[in-house]
């Protein structure tokens, strides 16, 4: 059984006082546990939320660090790991809820040999008109424990991640990623290459805040730009990337790209409507990714072929 824990919460424009109180209460109820909770505000632009989050300083063993500038999801996590005083870390996103009273205990009861563990996530009921909710719900079956165990390195999220500090030092979050998206998948690639096993358990956090459809489409485009930048390192981890590469290998990507360009604005409007369609979302993402490849091709001399 683990004896010490540093709970690390990266925060950006999110009120997280209730989450911190809940985690602190669970830690207090575990006899003999040495713990700390470190919240790092990553240069939030909402000053009201930054000030409200100072309420957590009323709690014992809680540290609140307010950064002046936003440094991104990877760098803030590396920073948190550097600040931790204990060798065992638990990353939780500030916009999550802990739905069970034994959440911390379940991680503490892991074998001392466990280096990385992931507990999964649940979805709070959302609106059928919300694209993010519909997308996460459709993906839910693939993220059940039995499915995660089949693909331990691909089914990993940093929003609920138990990891040893030494592993973060060996496989740090890539600070070249300044935008949102695919840092989880890249970590899975790094852990697999380092032969560091991931233990999957049923110990979820609850996802309950769903951004607007327009915001989610923008975040998706941002994440696809990350995926494109990481295309060599991620390899076959991404099914979407594999599809785009196959279409390029068969030289049919330009056909789809021309179709996507004609449909782009209409599809985007549909996704931002009150009845978003997941098939349209899938098609939009593929076209957007192919367009990134095409933009690179147009900046380089070719002999009629293009590199995958």
Regions found by a protein language model. Give the residues of each.
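N-proximal low-complexity "stem/linker" segments adjacent to membrane-targeting elements
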Residues: 1-25
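Acidic donor-binding segment of Leloir-type glycosyltransferases
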Residues: 23-66
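Glycine-rich, basic loop-to-helix element that forms the pyrophosphate-binding segment
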Residues: 67-84
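Short aromatic/hydrophobic "clamp" motif used to bind/position activated sugar donors
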Residues: 89
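Conserved donor NDP-sugar-binding/catalytic core segment of glycosyltransferases
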Residues: 97-132
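A recurrent flexible, glycine/aromatic-enriched loop bordering the glycosyltransferase active site
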Residues: 144-163
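Acidic donor-binding loop at a coil-to-helix junction in glycosyltransferase catalytic cores
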Residues: 179-187
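Non-catalytic, C-terminal membrane-associated alpha-helical segments of glycosyltransferases
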Residues: 222-225, 241-308
């Amino acid at each position: 059984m683990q004896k010490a824990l540093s709970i690390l919460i990266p925060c950006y424009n999110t009120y997280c006082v209730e989450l911190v109180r809940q985690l602190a209460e669970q830690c207090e109820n575990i006899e003999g546990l040495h713990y700390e909770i470190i919240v790092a505000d990553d240069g939030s632009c909402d000053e009201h939320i930054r000030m409200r989050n100072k309420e957590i300083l009323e709690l014992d063993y809680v540290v609140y660090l307010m950064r002046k500038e936003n440094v991104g999801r990877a760098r803030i996590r590396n920073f948190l790991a550097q600040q931790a005083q204990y060798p065992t870390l638990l990353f939780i996103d500030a916009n999550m809820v802990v739905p069970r009273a034994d959440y911390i205990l379940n991680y503490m009861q892991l074998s001392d040999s466990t280096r990385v563990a992931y507990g999964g996530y649940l979805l709070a009921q959302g609106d059928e008109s919300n694209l993010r909710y519909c997308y996460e719900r459709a993906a839910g079956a693939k993220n059940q424990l039995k499915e995660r165990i089949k693909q331990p390195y691909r089914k990993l999220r940093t929003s609920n991640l138990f990891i040893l500090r030494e592993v973060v030092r060996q496989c740090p979050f890539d600070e070249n990623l300044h935008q949102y998206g695919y840092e989880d998948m890249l970590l899975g690639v790094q852990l697999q290459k380092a032969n560091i096993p991931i233990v999957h358990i049923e110990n979820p956090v609850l996802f309950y805040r769903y951004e607007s459809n327009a915001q989610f489409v923008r975040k998706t485009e941002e994440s696809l730009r990350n995926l494109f930048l990481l295309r060599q390192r991620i390899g076959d981890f991404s099914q979407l990337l594999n599809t785009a590469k196959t279409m390029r290998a068969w030289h049919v990507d330009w056909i789809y790209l021309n179709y996507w360009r004609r449909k782009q604005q209409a599809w985007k409007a549909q996704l931002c409507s009150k009845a978003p369609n997941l098939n349209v979302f899938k098609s939009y993402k593929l076209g957007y990714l192919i367009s990134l490849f095409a933009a690179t091709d147009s900046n380089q001399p070719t002999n009629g072929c293009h590199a995958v």
